[in-house]
Amino acid sequence: MGQKVHPNGIRLGIVKPWNSTWFANTKEFADNLDSDFKVRQYLTKELAKASVSRIVIERPAKSIRVTIHTARPGIVIGKKGEDVEKLRKVVADIAGVPAQINIAEVRKPELDAKLVADSITSQLERRVMFRRAMKRAVQNAMRLGAKGIKVEVSGRLGGAEIARTEWYREGRVPLHTLRADIDYNTSEAHTTYGVIGVKVWIFKGEILGGMAAVEQPEKPAAQPKKQQRKGRK
């Protein structure tokens, strides 16, 4: 059987950035990796209702900088920044170095694979029909400008005795094209019948120019100059 490689892993360094960007020598590497895992585990649990898309960790000079990408920055920050200050203290304790927490807003949650997958799982847990949840996610993504989307759910769908897999796809989802900007993520719905797995692939277009094009902020389009009409003398 043909197997699918992880769409994010194969594109790292080509059109996808890493979620942890730091360098460590052999002695510190394992400790850093462990603290990264614990920080992510804590933040994911603490901010379960804050629509967190991804957590990026950097380690500049004996400190840790955590960037939380979320669709609901208000919930993360809290009243007068109280919640984010509490998070900062706990992260500093876990990592053992001074911590800084930045918040990045996800402007279009319908085009973020993690948030789409989480939305479907929350609907499945509320006993919404799985086909309706999938179709709604596909329609919303295409309406907001996705070039293609594929949604797959797997498990005891609708409480069936035998587990099965169903999927919907609209538009193009080119998994082999390395320059294709494909956002992929998964989530799990814990229902009374068992666990239902959800996978989401969103194709946002092709990135020409590799990582340099990804890291550069988008420049505003130059306004065309109006040609001055010369009057008759």
Curated annotation (Swiss-Prot):
It comes from the Bacteria. Gene3D superfamilies: 3.30.300.20, Ribosomal protein S3, C-terminal domain. Pfam families: KH_2, Ribosomal_S3_C. GO terms for molecular function: mRNA binding; rRNA binding; structural constituent of ribosome. One of its GO terms (biological process) is cytoplasmic translation. GO terms for cellular component: cytoplasm; cytosol; cytosolic small ribosomal subunit. The keyword ATP-binding does not apply. Keywords: Ribonucleoprotein, Ribosomal protein, RNA-binding, rRNA-binding. Residues 39-107 form the KH type-2 domain. Binds the lower part of the 30S subunit head. Binds mRNA in the 70S ribosome, positioning it for translation. Belongs to the universal ribosomal protein uS3 family. Part of the 30S ribosomal subunit. Forms a tight complex with proteins uS10 and uS14. With proteins uS4 and uS5 encircles the mRNA as it enters the ribosome, which may play a role in mRNA helicase processivity. Some nascent polypeptide chains are able to cross-link to this protein in situ. In collided ribosomes contacts ribosome rescue factor SmrB. This is Small ribosomal subunit protein uS3. It comes from Escherichia coli (strain K12). The gene is rpsC.
